[in-house]
Regions:
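Small cysteine-rich, disulfide-bonded extracellular modules of the LU/uPAR three-finger superfamily
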Residues: 1-94, 102-141
Length: 141
């Protein structure tokens, strides 16, 4: 049997080396965007949400750690909240939450991760909660 794995510390260190001290922003995209793992920079994204109350959010209280029980390196943060997103009815629907490593503008800001995030905007509060299993937004397993 072939064995090939990263230690939990290496998983954590991979996140730490790339993201420690970085400004990480969250964008919400509509289904106009077609996810593509070959996309590198935020300038390659399309379909960013445009509605009342929307703005890109910066992750706060970022913590990078390893979880030896779940065998992951992970990045957790305070859940970003949009207080009143979209019109009262007929607002756009989100399809994805995208995490980027911000660097002056979209042409230099690297895409970290694209996650499914379906929400019909209706002027209500929206909180982007972390993955329930890992209690994190990003992880390497």
């Amino acid at each position: 049997m072939a064995t090939n794995w990263l230690s939990n510390r290496a998983r954590k260190q991979a996140l730490y080396a790339h993201l420690n001290g970085a400004t990480i922003k969250v964008l919400l995209l509509t289904s106009d965007y077609m996810p593509n793992k070959d996309h590198v920079f935020a300038s390659e994204l399309s379909g960013e949400l445009t509605c009342t109350g929307y703005e890109r959010k910066t992750l706060a209280s970022v913590v990078i750690s390893q979880d030896d029980t779940l065998d992951v390196g992970k990045l957790a943060a305070t859940a970003p909240v949009w207080a009143a997103l979209g019109p009262a009815s007929g607002g756009p629907e989100t399809a994805y939450a995208v995490f980027i490593k911000w660097d002056t503008d979209d042409e230099h800001s690297e895409i970290i991760s694209v996650k499914d995030c379906v929400l019909q905007t209706n002027s209500g509060q929206f909180t982007l909660n972390p993955n329930a299993t890992y209690a994190a937004y990003l992880w390497i397993s």
